């Protein structure tokens, strides 16, 4: 709870207290579980229990285990309003995912993609230079390159469209490209009937 992102939970708790939903689901980076030696998650669970919600132990789930070709691990916290729980209710069990070997990056790629998504020579050269620099330092940081046969991409974040380094797609005979907004939506589990109401640049 050291910055604005950390205090956001208290806004969530305030909304839950005011609206009393039958159920809720919260998602965060998996590192939350060990943040501040586990004290942060203890505070969160304590507050949710004080709101009179049944909250089972949070679980870390990976999108790739649920049919999405993205290696995205997140801690999931669910809660159920005790006023609506059945009398014979025992406990909630999180779904158990599995690896589907048929799932691959090609599943989310669009057939036709505009040239504007191909990164410039300058950006591509910069990515490669930083990759070489990180390699000399002995770490694996730098851009990540994938193709249609890759099993999954790395995790994409809100900053993806700054340079696309988290997940670039190989192209024959030219620089790699960034994912389109539709492809990003598919990686987040949205079906194609989900409307992206803004331009490519803003989305």
Predicted regions and their residues:
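FAD-binding beta-loop-beta segment adjacent to the flavin cofactor pocket
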Residues: 167-170, 174-202
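Internal anion-binding site segments
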Residues: 148, 157-158, 162-171, 179
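Class I S-adenosyl-L-methionine
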Residues: 1-155, 159-161
């Amino acid at each position: 709870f050291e910055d604005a992102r950390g205090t956001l939970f208290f806004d969530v708790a305030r909304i839950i207290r005011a609206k009393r939903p039958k159920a809720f689901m919260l998602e965060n980076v998996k590192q939350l579980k060990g943040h501040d030696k586990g004290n942060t998650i203890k505070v969160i669970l304590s507050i949710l229990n004080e709101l009179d919600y049944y909250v089972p132990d949070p679980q870390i789930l990976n999108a790739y285990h649920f049919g999405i070709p993205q290696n995205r691990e997140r801690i999931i916290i669910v809660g159920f309003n005790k006023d609506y729980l059945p009398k014979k209710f025992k406990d909630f069990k999180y779904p158990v995912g599995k690896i589907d070997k048929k799932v691959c990056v090609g599943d989310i790629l669009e057939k036709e993609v505009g040239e504007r998504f191909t990164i410039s020579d300058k950006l591509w050269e910069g990515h490669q230079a930083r990759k070489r620099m990180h390699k000399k330092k002995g770490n694996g940081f730098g851009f990540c390159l994938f193709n249609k046969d890759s099993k999954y991409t790395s995790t994409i974040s809100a900053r993806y469209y700054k340079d696309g380094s988290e997940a670039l797609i190989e192209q024959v005979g030219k620089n790699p490209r960034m994912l389109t907004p539709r492809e990003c939506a598919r990686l987040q589990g949205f079906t194609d009937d989900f409307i992206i109401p803004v331009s490519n640049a803003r989305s």
